[in-house]
Structure formats: structure tokens, C-alpha cells
Amino acid sequence: MHAVTKIFIIFIFVFILWTLYVENDITNRTRNTDNIDDLLESANRLERLLKFEAKKIAALAEDVHKIRANRKGKHVIMEEMVSQDLKQWKDPIPVLVFSCNRAMAVRDHVEKLIRYRPSQEKFPIIVTQDCDNENVKNEVKKFGDKVEYIKHLAGDKANITIPPSHRQYTAYYRIARHYKLALNHVFVDKGYSSVIITEDDLDISPDFFSYFSSTRYLLENDEKLWCVTAWNDNGKQENIDMTAASTLYRSDFFAGLGWMMSSKTWHELEPIWPVGFWDDWMRDPARRKDRQCIRPEISRTGMMSYGKEGASKGQFFSKHLAKIKVNDKYINFGKIDLDYLLPANFAKKTNLEVMKEAVELSIDNVASFVLSSENKGKSVRVMYDGNIDYIRKADKLHIMHDFKAGVPRTAYDGIVTCFINGIRIYLVPDRTKVSAYNPDWSVPPSFGE
């Protein structure tokens, strides 16, 4: 029985007793007409008592209502907490750091990883070295038991078969071999279910680990995903929304440069792993199989100055890589519902933002549109009808204009987005002329890098 009901019964009982008392009092008092004042006083007392008890009952009813509402609210909050907790990946996610002969680079990179790492048990760091460089080994050993160091026969001593026409690309063959050996160590020897892959010339953001651990459940539950990357190829400060540090996207483009994959994906790729150029090999439609990656608006990795000394001899470094902005604000992705990145949700969201909310303009009109302060917060779309058209329009927006297996960098369903002067801009394929990605698309030499 509720408290209000009990109080009401007691009140009725008291009221009946009081009424009997008053009636008896009235009977006695009517014998004496001189006691009229006493009768009126009794009636007034009864009226005041009724008002007082009514207020008490109303107050108690309000308290009961609040208690019920609070219980319901706590129940909803608990359900949300349980739901979100189920999305937090419980298994360890090792960070596999690839190194060769840059001692200071690996020192700086590992220092950053340790500084931002919330737990050594959750995020063990494994540094794998390919070259016989004692300085690198010594720098890694200084970290003691904070990291694991692994070493195998160096690539220059492994008698790798390299086609005569590819002698100048020898480093890429050694790197592919290194990746296979190190990833087998993580997934076969150690038995981990996922890995974050980094290179010794990368800078990282304060929320690097939050980003990867909170997106891991997406990799597990979405068969259309095969990686989470920390890198935005168009992540120069003038091309991104600096207020959108928590914004993430799906992308058909495999970027690398700080990325995560599952053991399931590795067990698929390992038997057919290439002898060279592993990243372009992964971008091939035969391997990608229309799968996608998660990428951020603001990169969670950046390129340190050591990058210009890498295997690519600084290709793209000064013009693009060195200019990528690394996020400097901590975002707790564990408190954000990332289900909007699931395939159907993201497709619906993108269609709304691109085809319904954005205004269609020519690339020439976009230039004047972004200069007007009145247009801040608006979005526009620019259509393209082929690779040359895309290259020209990308150049006007100062974003990367190249393709890998026909996929523009950062593209999702052919759509490439950037953010300039407060305006969201979408480069969108004209589906009457561009039906799908074309692996034959390339950049003519006349357009440069």
C-alpha cells in the first residue's frame, strides 16, 4: 500500500472521530445557547485542520511523484551506461611501432605513446626493428619493460627477390617483408585480436588511444569496415573544421599512417601478402572488396620532421604531409554514440547533408561564396564528371588531387569533403557520367603531384 493511501485512510479516521466529537459537543452545547461562540470556534478549528491536512497530502503526493521520476531516470541512465559500456573494447590492443634506422625518431614517437597511454596492460607497445642499427635498439632498450622490442633478420641480409626493374624500390620490398613478420608476431605468436600500426616518424594526439579503443567495436560488428585510420589526407588546417574534433567519417580510401585492423582481416591477408608495395596492394579492389575505413575530421597522427628521411625520400612531405594538423584537444570518444558511423546510418546522414542541405554551385562561384561572412555555417556541393574535372576542382580547393585504384583520397561513395572559411564543401560525382570508381583514373604529369 502506497504511503499516500495510508495517510488518506488515517486522515479519514481522524476526521470521523473529530466529527463524532463535534456532534457530541454540539448536542451538549445546544442545551446551553450561551455557548454559540464555542461552537463556531470548533468549526473554525475543523476547517483549519482540513486545509492543513490537504496541504500535507499534496506535498506527499509530489514527493512520491519525484521519487518515481528519479527512479525512472536512473533506470534510463543505467541502461545507457550498460549499452555504452558494451561498446568499450575490453581486450588489449597492442601498438606495433615499425622502425629501422632513425634512433631519435623512434625515441620521440615512443615517448609520446607512453605519455598518452592510459594503461600498459590495455595498450602494450611493441617496437619492431628491421635494420641492424644499434642506436635504434639502444634507444628502445632505455624504455625498459614499458615496451617490448623485437628484431628479426634485417631485410638487406634476407636475400629478398626484387625484380630488376624495381631495384630503386628495394626499400618497399623490405618494408612489406617487415610488416608480414611483425604482424605475424602480433596475431600468431601473441594471439592478439587487433593491432594499432604506427611508424617511428609519426606524431600522435592526446586522444589517440581513446579514438582507437572507442571505434574498435565498429570493426567487430560491421563487415563493411576493415580499418580505422588516424589520418586525414586533406587534414591541413585551412581545409578542416577546427571546431569538429569529435567528427568522424567512413571512407573508401585506405590511408594508413596510424591505423587499426583486426586479427580476422590479417588472417585473410597474410596468405596472399605481397612482396612489395603493401599499401597500394591493399587499395586494389580485389583486396578492398568495397570495404571502408573510419577516419577523423582532424588527424590523430601527424608527420614529424623525420618523415622526409623515409623510404619515399620525402615525396609529398613538404607540400602535404608536413602540413597535416594533429588534433590537440582530448576527446573522450567513449562518451560519444558512434553508431552514426554504421553503414545505413552514415549513408542516410550523408545523403541528407550533401544532396538535400548543401547548395549546388559551380567551382568558380564557390570562391566568392566562401569569402562572404554571411555564408558561414552553410554547405555547398560541386559536381565533377571525370578524373580531369576532379583534379582541377580539387586543385582550386587546395586538397590532394590524386587517386589510388581510382579512389580519391578520403572519398566516401565518390564524395570528398573539406571545410574552408566556415563553409562545408563537397565534391560530388555526377552519377550520370561517373557511375563508380574507375581504377584507370590517374593524374597526368602536367598536373604535378
Curated annotation (Swiss-Prot):
Subcellular location: Golgi apparatus membrane; Cytoplasm, Perinuclear region
BP terms from Gene Ontology: protein N-linked glycosylation
Cytoplasmic side: 1-6
GO cellular component term, pick one: Golgi membrane
TM region positions: 7-23
Co-factor binding details: The cofactor is mostly bound to the substrate.
Main location: Golgi
List of residues binding Mn(2+): 201
Any GO MF annotation of the entry: alpha-1,3-mannosylglycoprotein 2-beta-N-acetylglucosaminyltransferase activity
Keyword Cell cycle: no
Family membership: Belongs to the glycosyltransferase 13 family.
Function in brief: Initiates complex N-linked carbohydrate formation. Essential for the conversion of high-mannose to hybrid and complex N-glycans.
Official protein name in the record: Putative alpha-1,3-mannosyl-glycoprotein 2-beta-N-acetylglucosaminyltransferase
Organism of provenance: Caenorhabditis elegans
